[in-house]
């Protein structure tokens, strides 16, 4: 669309960056302490668990990008992939902080749920950052949309840095405190990610004529 993007549409889109900022911040801030202090996981093992999704992202994100372009070419929208991520991420995030196990079993639980959360995050984030180019064909308007996204991302990071530790403390620390925090953050993720995912139904996609296949995507 070439018309200027309205304030309501800008806010609806940028709201997703509060969710992405929160998810990008909280695991790095609290997950290591949750595993070592509340679950009894050795620090070295906990460090490996926290690092694991970064390696997975390098393989999975290009796959999501290729799938998003194929979806856009087939349906004219990226909505289904965005919705999949918006719905799956809150569930996986809450599950990270609900381990029924301790020690090595807890490390495995957190590793699996963290990878699932990272995968769900990619399902939302990869098509989400492609939307500004499809919301307007004017470079200055795309820049404006991106600026809004960055501002809301900053808000999300700041909110996460203050809210998550405060909720853990108010809920009594320990496993219960982290479980309550996970549920609160999951609710925040659900709201902030669903709004732009549903709003993307009104944004016609503009994928390339020939989206990359899986092998080509992994080479990029």
Task: Indicate where each model-derived feature is located.
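Membrane-embedded alpha-helical bundles of multi-pass transporters/translocases
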Residues: 1-220
């Amino acid at each position: 669309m070439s018309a200027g993007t309205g304030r309501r549409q800008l806010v609806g889109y940028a709201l997703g960056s509060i969710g992405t900022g929160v998810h990008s911040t909280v695991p790095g801030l609290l997950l290591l302490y949750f595993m070592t202090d509340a679950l009894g996981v050795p620090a070295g093992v906990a460090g490996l668990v926290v690092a694991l999704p970064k390696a997975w992202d390098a393989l999975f994100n290009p796959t999501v990008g290729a799938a998003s372009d194929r979806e856009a070419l087939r349906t004219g929208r990226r909505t289904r992939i965005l919705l999949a991520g918006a719905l799956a991420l809150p569930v996986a995030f809450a599950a990270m902080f609900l381990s029924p196990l301790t020690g090595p079993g807890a490390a495995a639980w957190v590793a699996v749920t963290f990878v699932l959360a990272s995968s769900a995050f990619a399902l939302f984030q990869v098509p989400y950052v492609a939307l500004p180019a499809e919301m307007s064909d004017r470079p200055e308007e795309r820049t404006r949309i991106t600026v809004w996204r960055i501002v809301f991302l900053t808000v999300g990071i700041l909110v996460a840095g203050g809210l998550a530790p405060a909720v853990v403390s108010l809920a009594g620390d320990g496993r219960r405190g982290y479980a309550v925090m996970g549920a609160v953050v999951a609710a925040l993720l659900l709201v902030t990610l669903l709004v732009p995912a549903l709003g993307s139904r009104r944004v016609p996609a503009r994928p390339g004529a020939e989206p990359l296949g899986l092998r080509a995507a992994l080479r990029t």
